[in-house]
Structure formats: C-alpha cells, structure tokens
Regions:
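Acidic, low-complexity, intrinsically disordered peripheral segments
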Residues: 23-26, 33, 81, 417-455
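Periplasmic alpha-helical coiled-coil/stalk elements that build and connect Gram-negative outer-membrane
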Residues: 137-250, 260, 365, 369, ...
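Short, charged, amphipathic alpha-helical segments
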Residues: 121, 184-193, 335, 401-409
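Amphipathic alpha-helical coiled-coil segments
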Residues: 48-63, 134, 138-157, 211, ...
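Sec-dependent signal peptide recognition
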Residues: 3-11
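Bacterial Sec-pathway N-terminal export signals of envelope proteins
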Residues: 22-70, 183, 223, 229-265, ...
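Small/polar-residue-enriched beta-strand and adjacent coil segments characteristic
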Residues: 70-83, 90-133, 256-265, 272-351
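C-terminal segment of classical bacterial N-terminal signal peptides
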Residues: 14-23
Length: 455
C-alpha cells in the first residue's frame, strides 16, 4: 500500500513537471520587426562595426589635437663620481637634479596636419558606411530566414489539407472496393498517393525545423525555442514607379570615400617634400651643483671655499627643417600615390556598373515577382475549380480515380506556387531595398513603406 502511494505521488510529480515544461515552452510570438530588432541587438558583426566606428571618432579627435601645442614635463636626478677637477677646483654633482617643462607648437608641416584631419573625417565616414552595410546584411539574412520559415510552414499546412483530402478519398475508395464497386488497383493508387503525401509532409516538417533553428540562431534565441510568426498573411498590390538609383548604397559611398582617401594621400606625400617649422619653448630649473676650491685668505693662508649653483633657465627656439636631397624617394612616393588614386577611380567605375546591374536586376525581380503572384493566383483558382468539378464527377462515377488524383496534384502544385511567389516577393522587396541602399530597421514592407504599395 505504501509503495503504491509513493508511485502515485511520483507519477503526479512527473505529470506536474511535464505540464510546467509545456507552459514554459509556449511558442514565442515574433513579427518581422521584432525579429529584426533581436537580430540587430545580438549581431557580433554589427557590434564590431560599432566599435570600429567609435574608434574612427577617436581618431578624428586625435587628428584635431595635432593643431594644438604639446606640453611635456621632465625631471632628472644625477649622481656623478668622482668629482670633476676643473683647474684646481672640484665640481661636485652628487645628487644634482633638474626639472623642466617644454612647449612644442607646430607652425607649418607642409599641410600634413590638415590632410591628416581630412583623412580622419573620411575614416569616420567610412566606418559609418561599413556599419550601415553590416546592418543591412543582418536585415537581409533575417528577412530571408523569416519569410522562408513562413513559406515552409504554409506548405506544411497545405500538405496537411492535401492529406485530409487523400484520407477522405482513400476511405471512399476502400468502401467502394468492399462493396464491389471499385477495383483493387484504384485502392492501391489511392494508398500510394497517400504514402507520397506522408513522405512530402515529413520532408517539409524537417525543413520547417531547420528553418526555425536558423531563425533562432539569427535572433539569438535557443535552438529549441518554438516560434509563432505573426506576419503570415501577405497582401500585395502592384508596385509603384521604382528606380535603380545606387547613390545611397553603402558600397558605392565606400568606393567614393576611397577615391577621396587616395587623393588626400597624394597631398600627404607632397608634404614630405615641403619644409616644416616648429616653435619650442622651455624652462628648466636645476640645483645641488657644488664647486669646491681653496682661496687665499691673506698672509698666504688658503681656506676652503664652496659655492652651490641653483637657478632656472628659459629658452625659446624656432626649428626649420628643409628636405634637400633624398635620391628622388619623395617624388616617387607622390607618383605612387597618384597611381593609387587612378586605381581607386577605376575600381569605383567598375563596381558602379556592377552595382547598377544588381539594382536593375533587383528592380526587375520586383515587377516579375508581382506578375508571378498574379499568375499563381489565377492558376490556383483554376486548379480549385478543376478539383471541385472533377470531385463532383467522380462522386457520380463520371470521372476516373486517376483524373481526381491529377486534379488534387494540380491543386497542390498551384497552392505551392502561390506560397513560393508571395514569400519570394517579400524577399525581393528586401533585396531591392538593399540594392539601392535604403534598407533599415524601419523600412519594413509590412509597415506600408512608401516604396511599395502593400496592404
């Protein structure tokens, strides 16, 4: 009796634990916007881009400080032995100290400081564009994973509906065979079709699980987290007048900045051929320097005498440095910088054509994707009507089983085509925004973005 009581208690505890786990594993509701926010917040690549941007801002501040004077302080202690003999006198420097402060102000550096500041500003702009480019890449990956998961789940739901049709048909054929109104061949055909649907469902569910884990990885969730996507209904209207302008694309701006960088590098190389002028001012205080000697006190008496030196000195210096001859090295540096500038221009020209082609391709995908949706919708309506008519004819023995199976297969394919067309269109929208450089967390097509006429 006691053992049964403990078994009952253990069973109750296990059931309670399982119920608690089921509650804890309730599906997490996610919209496309929330997925984007989560992906951006946990992206290591975006965090690295942010740190590089902060570094570029510090570099700009460092470059600006080159215009300002620099102050340096120094202190020195010296112990010299033995004492230094100076024409019968001894110079004692045991514990001598010096302390001073120096001010250095560049007056002219051939334009290096100004060029360095311009380069630091370009570096900040480059880091900002790289950060924006990384952000876009994260959004593209997130959107692709989101819409792919929706497509797979809709296909699973479609296959489940198809399976219900096949189960009903199989039961109907089986009843007819048992009543002597059908053949075993028809039953085998129905059973084979039902087995094929089960196989396709298993494949689709496996793909769904992989897509879910991929989205969990992108958003920083545990791979076992169940997800409930909210943006499952897709309404699409004809897109408006769109352009393939790449001027806002980060890659295009990066190439333009690179051209400007190489142009400034030419000025930096020329600065090596120009004189530099600097002003140096300093003040030094020294002490504990002693001079020991013997002096005549009168009557031929020599008495020891000691004097300690303790004073401060100030100095102002103007430094001028003029490069005279370096075997043409600086001139060759200028020529090399000019070649880098020409290469950067060629790189900009070549990649601009490629980016224009990519933007035009993305634009074409938008219009083609919309046409595919229209075609798929018409095909689905026709397949649904064909299935309805064929099913009615089969019920009154005016159509063969193979005709009904073909009609069901056509409906499945038409439904699958529409799912693919709709979800692929949403991916095309994201890719288009990426291609023209206007993709950001707020440019969601679901938010009635002005680039797309979506409901």
């Amino acid at each position: 009796m006691r053992d049964k009581f403990f078994q009952l208690l253990l069973t109750t505890a296990i059931i309670f634990t399982q119920q608690s786990n089921l509650k804890a594993q309730e599906a997490l509701k996610l919209s496309l916007t929330s997925c984007r926010e989560m992906a951006l917040s946990q992206s290591e690549s975006l965090q690295q881009a942010e740190y590089k941007y902060q570094q570029s801002r510090l570099d700009k501040q460092i470059a600006s400080s080159a215009f300002l004077p620099k102050f340096e302080a120094s202190a020195t202690g010296t112990y010299v032995f033995p004492d230094i003999d100076m024409m019968g006198m001894e110079l004692r420097m045991r514990g001598t100290y010096m302390a001073g402060i120096t001010l250095t102000q560049p007056l002219y550096t051939g334009g290096k400081i100004m060029t360095g500041k311009k380069l630091s500003k370009l570096g900040e702009s480059i880091a900002a564009e790289q950060k924006r480019m990384t952000m876009m890449d994260v959004l593209v990956e997130t959107d692709n994973a989101y819409w792919t998961l929706i497509a797979v789940r809709q296909k699973v739901a479609m296959l489940e509906s198809y399976k219900e049709q096949m189960d009903s048909l199989f039961a109907q054929v089986k009843t007819a065979v048992e009543a002597g109104l059908g053949t075993e061949n028809e039953l085998l055909r129905a059973e084979a079709s039902r087995s094929d649907i089960l196989y396709q469902m298993q494949k689709a569910k496996n793909g769904e699980d992989l897509c879910r884990m991929s989205l969990c990885r992108i958003t920083g969730l545990d791979s076992s987290t169940e997800l409930e996507l909210t943006d499952t209904t897709i309404y699409v209207k004809e897109p408006g007048l769109l352009t393939a302008d790449i001027n806002e694309r980060p890659e295009f701006n990066l190439l333009k900045h690179q051209v400007n960088v190489t142009q400034q590098q030419i000025q930096m190389s020329r600065a090596d051929m120009l004189p530099t002028i600097g002003l140096v001012a300093g003040y030094t205080y020294y002490g504990n320097i002693k001079l020991n000697s013997l002096v005549d006190a009168g009557n031929g008496t020599m008495m020891p005498y000691s004097q300690e030196f303790r004073d401060g000195l100030g100095a102002v210096m103007l430094s001028v440095k003029i490069p005279i001859f370096e075997w043409g090295a600086n001139l060759k540096k200028v020529k090399k910088a000019k070649l880098d500038f020409k290469n950067a221009e060629l790189e900009l020209s070549r990649n601009s054509r490629l980016m224009n082609l990519e933007a035009q391709s993305a634009l074409k995908n938008i219009y083609d994707g919309y046409q595919l949706i229209q075609t798929a919708e018409i095909g689905l309506k026709q397949a649904e009507e064909n299935l309805r008519v064929t099913n009615n004819k089969y019920n009154v023995s005016m159509a063969l089983l193979t005709d009904l199976l073909d009609a069901q297969s056509q409906w499945k394919q038409a439904k699958s085509n529409l799912i693919e067309a709709q979800t692929q269109y949403k991916i095309y929208e994201t890719n288009y925004l990426r291609a023209i450089g206007k993709l950001d967390p707020t440019s969601s097509p679901n938010a009635n973005n002005n680039l797309f006429l979506t409901e």
